[in-house]
Amino acid sequence: DFARIRDDIYQATGVESVYYRFPGGSSNTVSNIDMHEFIDYLDSQGVEYFDWNVSSGDGGSSNLSIDTLLENCTEDIDTRDTSIILLHDSAEKPTTVEALPDIIENILARPDTVILPITENTRPVHHVE
């Protein structure tokens, strides 16, 4: 599945994907494949995986309030050097997208805090090593 999807992404964008997020994170307990084997496979393909250390909480609920999403996404980011926030974008979770302007504004208003893309210089967050 991974190779096919990676190929599809390349065909659609012309960009080779070098980052991966496990559905449920690398610590998920429902995968049919041993996560360490999959991590080794990603390593062999030159792909870095990223988990998250801040959760919006929208994965378990279909429609959290904007205020709840804002609080979940911003309450602990000052305690970390790097925060990677997990958000879900789907038709069943419209308030997640609606909350984004408030989340971004809140983060950008903090001193010494910036929003950056994930690059080869980003220290990955891993649930499982």
Predicted regions and their residues:
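Catalytic domains of cell-wall/extracellular-matrix polysaccharide-remodeling enzymes
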Residues: 1-86, 90-108, 114, 120-128
